C-alpha cells in the first residue's frame, strides 16, 4: 500500500482491516484535496474558488437506513423506539464486506476531533473513498495541530464508501444504503450514499451516546456569547431560525449546530459550519454568503450557471443545498469554540397555526416540557394552494441523532438549568394574525428586538401575563415592538377561530407528550398546556 501524508504509524489503516487498499492519503490539505477531487472527476471548481460536488440520488440524510448495533452494552441504554437495532453478527458481515470492497481502492483519511473541550473530546478518524468527502469532514470537525498528528490515536473510526451497496438479506438492513453505528467498539460504516452530512451526524450521534454518562449534556443547537461573556444557546428544528438568529454582529459565534454543556460551560462539537444555501443572498446573510465565494468551501448540490457561478435560487437538484466551511471563515467566530455556562436558553419554534406568542418565559419544568416536545410546524408548498399546517414534534429538537431515551437528556438539561439559574425563553418565528395562509410571518425585526431584550436581561424585568393556553409568561409590552403581536389572539379577526385553533394545537401537544409522562416528574407533567377560557 502506498502511503502519503503525516500520520501515526501505529494506527495505520491496516489496524482496522483496510490493509488491502491500493493507497491512502492521510490528512491532506484543502489544496491537495481540491487537486485530487478535480483530477478524479468528483467535483469542479467554481468561478470564485469554492469546490462544488453533487451527491446523486441521495441529497439528504437517510434516517430509515440508520442502525445501531444492539449488544450487551447498548441493549439497556438505547431508545429502541427511535433507533433501529442491528445484530453484532450482521454488523460483522457488513464490516467484512465493506473492507473487502475497499481492497485496491485509493482512500483518504483525516484525523480530527469532535468536541472543543479537551476532557470530553472524541478523536475521530474518517476514512473516505471520495477526496471531496475528506475535505468536507476536514472543514466540519476540529482540526488538531499538525504536531499532534504523528501521535494521534482515534477513539472513533468512520468508514464511508458510497460505491458499496449493502444487501438487506445478508446485512440485516433495509436497502442498499446503510449507516451502521457500533457504539461499543467506536466504528461507523456508511455505504450506498454520497450525502456528506451522514459523516457529520454520525459523530454527533456517537457524542450524544457517550457524553450523558459523563454528566455532559449534548445539544442540537447554535450558540453565541456577548462581550461580557454572557453565553446563549438556541435550540430549534430546521427552518426555525437557529443559524440566522445566532449570527449576531454584536456577539461572538461559538457554533451553529452541535454543542455540549459540561461542568465548565458550553463547547462546540465542531470546527466548521454546514449551512443551507437555498435562496442565500449577500443582503440577508452576508457572512454565510461570503464563505461561498472563496477557496476551501465545499458547495453540495448547488447548481452552477454557464460561468460556473453558484445559483442559490435554483433548487432543481434539491431544496437541501449546502455549503461546508471551517469556522474561521466567519469573521466573528470564537477561536476556542468554548464559553461559560449559558445565561440564556432560547427554544425556537415556527408555529404555523398562528397560536403562540412571539416570546414567552419558561420555568425549568416548562423548559423541559418544551425540550422533550420539540415542536415546530411545517407548511406545504404554495404551489399546491393553502393547506393545513402540519405539526412536527422532534424530541430534544433532534430526535434522529438521540440514541438514548429523551428523558435522559431532558432531566440533565433541567438539572443544569436549575443549577446555573439559566433564563429560558420560547421564541416563535412562525405566523401571526392567523394561521399559515391567512396570517403573516412574524416580522424578523420584532423577533430580533425581543431576542436582544431577552439576552440583555431587560425583558425579564417587565410586566408579564399568563398565557391562557400554554401557561407560560408573556410580556405585556416591550419597547420598540408592536404591542399587538405579543397577544396572538388579539391579532386574529375571528376570535372563535383562534380559540378553536389553540385548542387543536394544545391537544396535539398533550397527545404527543403521553409517551414521556412515565419518565418525568410531576412538575414537568404539570407544565403541560391546557385551554382555559379566554376573555374577549
From Swiss-Prot:
Q: Where is the signal peptide?
A: none
Query: Source organism's superkingdom?
Result: Bacteria
Q: In which pathway does it act?
A: Carbohydrate biosynthesis; gluconeogenesis
What's the main place this protein lives? cytoplasm
- Any one GO molecular function term: phosphoenolpyruvate carboxykinase (ATP) activity
Set out the biological process GO terms recorded for this chain's protein.
Answer: gluconeogenesis
Q: Where in the cell is it found?
A: Cytoplasm
Ranges in a coiled coil: none
InterPro entries named in the record: PEP_carboxykinase_ATP (IPR001272), PEP_carboxykinase_C (IPR013035), PEP_carboxykinase_N (IPR008210), PEPCK_ATP_CS (IPR015994)
Q: Which Gene3D superfamilies match?
A: 3.90.228.20, Phosphoenolpyruvate Carboxykinase, domain 1, Phosphoenolpyruvate Carboxykinase, domain 2
SUPFAM superfamilies tied to this protein: PEP carboxykinase N-terminal domain (SSF68923), PEP carboxykinase-like (SSF53795)
Q: Which reaction does it catalyse?
A: oxaloacetate + ATP = phosphoenolpyruvate + ADP + CO2
Positions binding substrate in this chain are: 61, 195, 201, 322
Per UniProt, the keywords (alphabetical) are:
ATP-binding, Cytoplasm, Decarboxylase, Gluconeogenesis, Lyase, Manganese, Metal-binding, Nucleotide-binding
Q: What class of enzyme is it?
A: lyase
Tell me which EC number(s) this protein carries: 4.1.1.49
Job of this protein: Involved in the gluconeogenesis. Catalyzes the conversion of oxaloacetate (OAA) to phosphoenolpyruvate (PEP) through direct phosphoryl transfer between the nucleoside triphosphate and OAA.
Return the PANTHER family for the record.
PHOSPHOENOLPYRUVATE CARBOXYKINASE (ATP), PHOSPHOENOLPYRUVATE CARBOXYKINASE ATP
Family of the protein in this entry: Belongs to the phosphoenolpyruvate carboxykinase (ATP) family.
The name this protein goes by in its record: Phosphoenolpyruvate carboxykinase (ATP)
Please give the organism.
Rhizobium etli (strain ATCC 51251 / DSM 11541 / JCM 21823 / NBRC 15573 / CFN 42)
Q: What is the lineage of its organism?
A: Bacteria, Pseudomonadati, Pseudomonadota, Alphaproteobacteria, Hyphomicrobiales
